[in-house]
């Protein structure tokens, strides 16, 4: 009986670790809630692509540093970063926001974040970009965003909203 209990407990723990290992972890901290008085974002990027790189870009209104897959030689998909205006963005995949949606377009979050880093200086700029971005978006994500004005927010985004 003790062996069976130990085996079941071990399997339960290992199952929990497996699930946890594939969960993306993020945090958005507003300036008023941080010891330094500055907003912060944090992301543990869980991805099947284990080789990542930071790249400097000068292809937009603002220069920016972006996290890319190392094999993305053109830097088309940026998976988080910060620009020269003090705007920063990252995402956490949200697999349940497009349930029942038959749209085939998906995995466009990196393209969207690249555009946001190129063009946005504030949360208001990002909200305008979200309003005007073509739909369906090909996105299933929570975007964590901060700006130089002390703004900090999460945005839940799917193909249509």
Task: Tell what function each PLM region has.
Residues 1-8:
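Bacterial N-terminal signal peptides that target proteins for export
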Residues 4, 17, 61-63:
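Intrinsically disordered, low-complexity N-terminal regions enriched in serine/proline/glycine
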Residues 8-9, 66:
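Composition-driven detection of intrinsically disordered, low-complexity segments
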Residues 9-17:
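Bacterial N-terminal signal peptides
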Residues 17-23:
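Sec/Tat signal peptide C-region and signal peptidase I cleavage site
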Residues 23-108, 132, 136-140:
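A contiguous strand-loop segment
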Residues 26-29, 41, 112-124, 128-131:
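The feature marks the mature, well-folded catalytic cores of soluble enzymes
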Residues 33-35, 121-161:
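Accessory structured domains or lobes within enzymes
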């Amino acid at each position: 009986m003790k062996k069976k209990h130990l085996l079941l407990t071990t399997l339960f723990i290992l199952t929990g670790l497996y699930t946890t290992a594939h969960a993306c972890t993020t945090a958005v901290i507003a300036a008023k809630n941080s010891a330094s008085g500055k907003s912060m974002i944090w992301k543990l990027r869980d991805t099947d692509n284990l080789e990542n790189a930071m790249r400097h870009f000068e292809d937009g209104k603002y220069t920016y540093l972006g996290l890319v897959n190392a094999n993305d030689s053109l830097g088309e998909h940026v998976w988080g970063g910060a620009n020269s205006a003090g705007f920063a963005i990252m995402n956490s995949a949200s697999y349940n926001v497009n349930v029942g949606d038959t749209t085939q377009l998906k995995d466009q979050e990196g393209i969207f974040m690249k555009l946001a880093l190129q063009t946005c200086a504030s949360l208001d700029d990002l909200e305008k970009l979200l309003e005007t971005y073509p739909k369906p978006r090909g996105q299933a994500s929570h975007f964590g965003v901060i700006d130089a004005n002390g703004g900090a927010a999460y945005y839940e985004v799917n193909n249509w909203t």
